[in-house]
């Protein structure tokens, strides 16, 4: 089961139905990765910088907010508790302006990025980063978000 918690009302100004937007992105990603049949349990929190700052400090000892955090729980298996994803509206908005992309595109990217972390993908080493970015691009292209390139 996928559970979306909207913890900051500003998400409603980004998309009319934030819950459906998130569910569509995650479900399409699971399908593209050919793991939708596992029906994993994932909780997604649409939050703000304050919460992600607290979580980042507590779990990563980094004293600042970030765009997305993932907290893996179990290995992928049928109806497992795959983990939690939290996204900060403030950072997403700020980075969207910096990168000259839409907030929805950046949100979709961070949802896919967070999901891949739950599945064990990482980007600490160059070879891992190449694999993870390739999967992100493939999924975002399927969702028709890859057309809008990051202006970095």
Swiss-Prot record:
Give the similarity note.
Answer: Belongs to the endoribonuclease YbeY family.
Query: rRNA-binding: is it a keyword of this entry?
Result: no
Q: Which PANTHER family match?
A: ENDORIBONUCLEASE YBEY, CHLOROPLASTIC
Cofactor(s) required, per the database record: Zn(2+)
Task of the protein? Single strand-specific metallo-endoribonuclease involved in late-stage 70S ribosome quality control and in maturation of the 3' terminus of the 16S rRNA.
Protein name, per record: Endoribonuclease YbeY
Q: Name one GO biological process term.
A: rRNA processing
Asked if Cell wall biogenesis/degradation is a keyword of the record, the answer is: no
Entry cofactor note text?
Answer: Binds 1 zinc ion.
List the record's Gene Ontology CC terms alphabetically. Answer: cytoplasm
Q: Which principal EC class is assigned to this enzyme?
A: hydrolase
SUPFAM superfamilies this protein is in? Metalloproteases ('zincins'), catalytic domain (SSF55486)
**Keyword terms, alphabetized:** Cytoplasm, Endonuclease, Hydrolase, Metal-binding, Nuclease, Ribosome biogenesis, rRNA processing, Zinc
According to its UniProt record, where is this protein located?
Cytoplasm
InterPro entries per UniProt: MetalPrtase_cat_dom_sf_prd, YbeY, YbeY_CS
| Listed EC numbers | 3.1.-.-
């Amino acid at each position: 089961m996928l559970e979306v918690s909207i913890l900051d009302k500003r998400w409603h100004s980004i998309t009319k139905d934030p819950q459906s937007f998130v569910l569509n992105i995650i479900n399409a990603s699971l399908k593209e990765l050919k793991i939708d049949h596992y029906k994993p349990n994932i909780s997604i929190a649409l939050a703000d910088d304050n919460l992600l700052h607290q979580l980042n400090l507590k779990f990563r000892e980094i004293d600042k907010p970030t765009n997305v955090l993932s907290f893996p729980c179990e290995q992928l298996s049928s109806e497992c508790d795959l983990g939690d994803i939290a996204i900060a509206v403030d950072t997403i908005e700020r980075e969207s302006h910096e990168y000259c992309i839409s907030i929805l595109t950046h949100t979709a990217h961070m949802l896919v990025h967070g999901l891949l972390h739950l599945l064990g993908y990482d980007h600490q080493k160059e070879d891992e980063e190449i694999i993870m970015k390739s999967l992100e691009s493939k999924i975002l292209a399927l969702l028709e978000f890859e057309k809008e390139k990051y202006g970095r």
